[in-house]
């Protein structure tokens, strides 16, 4: 609703989430997922696009941009870094992240997430989101033992990952993660950090700022 009608957009859900189909991802890795997204872009003849990614999609975007050169910019919302993906939080946790994890533990993941969606969306949209999530959850519960929900991601996936300086990179993150991103695989001479928010789902709380950047691009 916040993007002008002249801007087209394509949303790709991870397998086994959102509106994507249910499939066993045993034996599948991140490169397989990158190839699948690349095939979608080719099939739809999409060129000159801006990648908007959240969390684990960040590392997928890095690999995709090395494969497809039509990306004009990357807007990354708290993309996953190698430092956090494989960190030992028992030794050196972020106090702020620890506080969020305590809230999730105290209220339970579902109630914590429901509070966020209720704050963000009108009741009709919020109801639709939760009906979809519950439907997907029920489908996943019916799968056979050994069913793998997500692709395997290893330390090797983060090796030799880089982004060319020609692509503008905009990273939305909470203030306490600034240093992490300045030292991460997403940092180039053409990277800009936008600090704000107090949870991981900044695509909701910072949506106006994200739209402003997309319009300018």
Q: Which functions belong to the PLM regions below?
A:
Residues 1-10:
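Short amphipathic alpha-helix adjacent to the substrate-entry channel of hydrolases
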Residues 17-20, 82, 201:
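Active-site loop signature of alpha/beta-hydrolase-fold enzymes
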Residues 198-207:
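Catalytic histidine-centered segment of alpha/beta-hydrolase-like enzymes
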Residues 74-107:
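Flexible "cap/lid" loop of the alpha/beta hydrolase fold
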Residues 122-197:
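Conserved serine/cysteine hydrolase catalytic core
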Residues 11-50:
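Active-site loop/oxyanion-hole signature of alpha/beta-hydrolase fold enzymes
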Residues 14-16, 79, 174:
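Active-site loop/turn elements of alpha/beta-hydrolase fold enzymes
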Residues 52-57, 61:
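Gly/Ala-rich beta-loop-alpha elbow adjacent to hydrolase catalytic centers
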